[in-house]
Amino acid sequence: MAQATDLLDRVTRFTSGFGVRGGYRAPTEAERSALLGGVTALFDGDVEKARTRLAEVDYRLDTFTDGPGGRRYAEVADAAARSGPADRGWGRVYVGLGAPVRWSVQVPHPIADQDTERLGVAVLRGAPGGVMVLAGAHRRAAGGPGGSDGDGEEGDGTGDGNAAGGGNAVGGGSGDKDGGGTGEADMAHRTDSVFHAVIAELTRRGLPGIQLHGFADSTVPGAGAVVSTGAGDAAAADAARLAAELASRGVRPCRAWSANCRMSGRGNAQGRLAAELGTRFLHLELARSVRADPGRRGEAARAIAAVTAGWAGE
């Protein structure tokens, strides 16, 4: 029987150890394949096969009931937890049980984009059939680039260029200090990670996703959010709905399809793949003042739930 616990507590205990001095190592192709094989088996409902494949790379699968939310989840996590530079930093995956997998919430920059991990939990709780893909390291771990915009947050940027630092980095940014990094642990701009591999599998299945980011209030003055469909437009109707829901809850959105918004994420690696495959993808940036206030963060989560509930078939 799944034990009762708190999803938010599990996530925040995990991310509380992140820092720019933390470790990250890109997985080998074999490691990535084994981990993805386990997660894919879990998506298909084969828990024992999932556990077997995950054990090949010292990952574990636990199930639990989220006390506050009441839903059951599976947690895919590193069983060989390490601290500091020795950490692999491959992240975690949380899968809602009791319903087919239908959509995802993606958190590529936990801690670096402050409270996006907390928002991710609230979003996952908001509708059945969800998957949360959570990065396992600070975006500047393992020697990633700096470039803070004032409160330690960089945003995802709008750049479409090729990044320096290797063929697995994309969306190099526009050169602005908030243009998004392409460091080894910047999951939004790399395609050789566990984070990208899991999202790529969901994207190939045609399942929609929303990726969460944060910006300093001074980066987009007057806006509490930037709503975008990234490099594609398959989620145009969803984006319009999300923007309207945010506005109705007092979070003023910049709509990237009708305005020249910074932080629109057109260089985002997962968004680019979604555009190639015609899968719905939403890129949401929230101002620090929205994320830092529990009430406003809750309103943002409820706005997102208006979209994810539709994805879940509710």
Predicted features and spans:
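N-terminal catalytic or cofactor-binding beta/alpha core of small enzyme domains
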Residues: 1-161, 165-313
